[in-house]
């Protein structure tokens, strides 16, 4: 993700608050946080999952249809001084456990170079996704 121009910061914060105030209560966004056991309330990491409705679609193995929402993993982070201690892995394992319990079969994410090895260890594979950023 690139740098956000200062002029857009307040607009983004307001738009995000508006989105989350609706999406969290209605279940379209679920989040996990990691906090220090010895200092409750001190958040050292987090991960989010946005649920998006999709049409029924063929399963990659081709033998059946997949139904239900697709999960888009967002906002996975660990505070710098707490990295390389398994926090992101623990958050992701819990997030994936939740998706299995809720029957969500299709999960995507956009990996940073630093996060890619973790996601590959968890079973994520690169795809051929492309993007178009049209003119507004």
Q: What annotation goes with each model-predicted range?
A:
Residues 92, 99-111:
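Conserved GNAT acetyl-CoA-binding A-motif
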Residues 54-60, 108-116, 120, 125-136:
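Conserved catalytic-core motifs of GNAT/GCN5-like acyltransferases
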Residues 30-33:
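Hydrophobic beta-strand residues of extracellular immunoglobulin-like
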Residues 28, 38-75, 80-83:
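Conserved acyl-donor/pantetheine-binding loop and adjacent beta-alpha core of acyl/acetyltransferases
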Residues 21-27:
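Short loop/turn motifs at secondary-structure junctions and domain boundaries
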